[in-house]
């Protein structure tokens, strides 16, 4: 049992490091992890005076929006890039579980992009002189861990969905801005048309943002964070099932192009 856990941890760590090394050569990583959060935060927070609690809400919305974008373009593109480079079959048919490999790569992408986004946001906060309210730092750390877990699971799911179509790159671009508008982050759900207010409830990052909104006013409301965790589990289970179906289909056809 211990040997199997050690092997699984080694597989995840190796995949994580491989993905992080590959990210160093991709210009898109700089765009989604540095340029985008800096631009969004400068536009949203730099054009008006904000109270400390309101600044916390704005920073949370911008950071989570940037993490969504980074998830789509980095973790969400893991398997699509493998297919482009011709290494997909080796990644998903080795002696190790393809789910573990994908988890490690998605986790590596999520950690790197999240670190870049947080660092970029911190620089802008200092330059703009924003006062950010953090009344419960430990709970904020818990929320950050949920964000990393959720981004990893969501990245795995998107990677599997993008894999089963030759138009994954187009879908990546198409998914960005609808969530910017309908994700309940930059635009509050109550500002959306009544018939669209259910959309943000499907996004775990929206629930993390709701939790942070409560924290900024001094209230600890575990319910939104619990919903985010539940959605993360749903994303992960769906991703593993989707990957298994995709790989099995490729094996039956004798090809891992899958489409």
What are these regions (language model features)?
Residues 1-259:
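Hydrophobic transmembrane alpha-helices and immediately adjacent juxtamembrane helices
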């Amino acid at each position: 049992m211990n040997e199997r856990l050690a092997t699984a941890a080694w597989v995840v760590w190796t995949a994580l490091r491989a993905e992080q090394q590959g990210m160093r050569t991709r210009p898109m990583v700089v765009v989604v992890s540095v340029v985008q959060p800096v631009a969004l935060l400068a536009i949203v927070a730099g054009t008006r005076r904000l109270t400390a609690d309101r600044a916390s809400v704005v920073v949370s919305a911008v950071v989570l929006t940037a993490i969504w974008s980074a998830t789509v373009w980095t973790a969400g593109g893991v398997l699509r890039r493998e297919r482009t480079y011709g290494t997909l079959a080796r990644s998903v048919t080795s002696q190790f579980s393809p789910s573990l490999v994908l988890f490690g790569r998605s986790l590596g992408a999520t950690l790197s992009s999240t670190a870049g986004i947080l660092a970029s946001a911190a620089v802008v906060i200092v330059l703009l002189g924003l006062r950010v309210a953090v009344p419960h730092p430990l709970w904020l750390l818990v929320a950050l861990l949920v964000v990393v877990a959720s981004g990893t699971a969501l990245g795995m799911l998107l990677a599997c969905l993008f894999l089963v179509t030759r138009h994954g790159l187009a879908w990546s671009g198409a998914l960005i801005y609808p969530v910017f508008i309908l994700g309940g982050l930059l635009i509050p759900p109550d500002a959306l048309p009544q018939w669209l207010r259910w959309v943000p409830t499907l996004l775990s990052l929206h629930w993390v943002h709701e939790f942070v909104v409560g924290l900024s006013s001094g209230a600890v409301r575990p319910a939104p964070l619990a919903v985010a965790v539940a959605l993360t589990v749903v994303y992960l289970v769906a991703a593993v099932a989707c990957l298994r179906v995709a790989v099995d289909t490729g094996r039956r056809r004798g090809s891992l192009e899958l489409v």
